């Protein structure tokens, strides 16, 4: 993908927009505060953006406060870990609960991990969504996708390089969408990106 922004937008276009429950509008669950692309992607896909709050005291979301009806009609849920603007990461146990929730209610869990390599305590790196899947024995990463970018980790926002990884069935649908929507990368940019991803 040409950066996390494109990936975060495109996954909703590729994977959401149906009536999950006949006669009811589907939704995308979005953290608040949020990256504006989450909301815009949901609106343009024709699904309702529904916000879940980040507790200002803990800088952590309270997923138990999400309306169960919204979970039933949810097609996709965004998480951002480490979060922006708080910098807080979701703990492993919380990620596991979210994966179980995604499988129970059959929605796609999309983790925006563009800040995953930025943390204060170098002895405690952030746990990613796919790592949590593996801890649970979910080696197919069912219902889960992660988005990464060079923008933050390598201070290269103008290079527009990112990737999506996770559930192979979801990636296949994403790639089909991107075949017709995404733009090609210049060869000299590709060479620079390869070097940057290796650092």
Feature locations, PLM:
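Conserved Walker B
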Residues: 113-115
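Alpha-helix termination/capping residues and helix-transition junctions
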Residues: 22, 71, 108, 138-141, ...
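Short loop/edge segments at beta-strand edges and connector loops
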Residues: 2, 111, 148
């Amino acid at each position: 993908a040409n950066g996390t922004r494109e990936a975060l937008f495109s996954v909703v276009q590729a994977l959401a927009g149906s009536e999950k429950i006949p006669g009811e509008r589907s939704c995308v669950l979005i953290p608040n505060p949020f990256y504006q692309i989450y909301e815009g992607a949901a609106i343009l896909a024709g699904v309702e953006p529904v916000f879940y709050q980040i507790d200002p005291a803990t800088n952590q979301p309270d997923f138990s406060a999400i309306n169960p009806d919204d979970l039933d009609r949810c097609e996709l849920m965004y998480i951002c870990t480490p979060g922006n603007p708080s910098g807080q990461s979701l703990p492993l146990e919380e990620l596991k609960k979210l994966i179980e929730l995604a499988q129970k209610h059959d929605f796609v869990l999309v983790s925006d991990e563009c800040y995953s390599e930025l943390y204060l305590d170098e002895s405690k790196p952030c746990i990613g969504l796919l790592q949590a899947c593996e801890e649970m024995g979910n080696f197919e990463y069912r219902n889960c996708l992660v988005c990464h970018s060079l923008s933050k980790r390598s201070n290269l926002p103008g290079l527009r390089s990112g990737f999506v990884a996770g559930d192979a069935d979801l990636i296949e649908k994403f790639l089909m969408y991107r075949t017709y929507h995404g733009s090609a990368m210049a060869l000299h940019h590709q060479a620079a990106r390869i070097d940057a991803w290796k650092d």
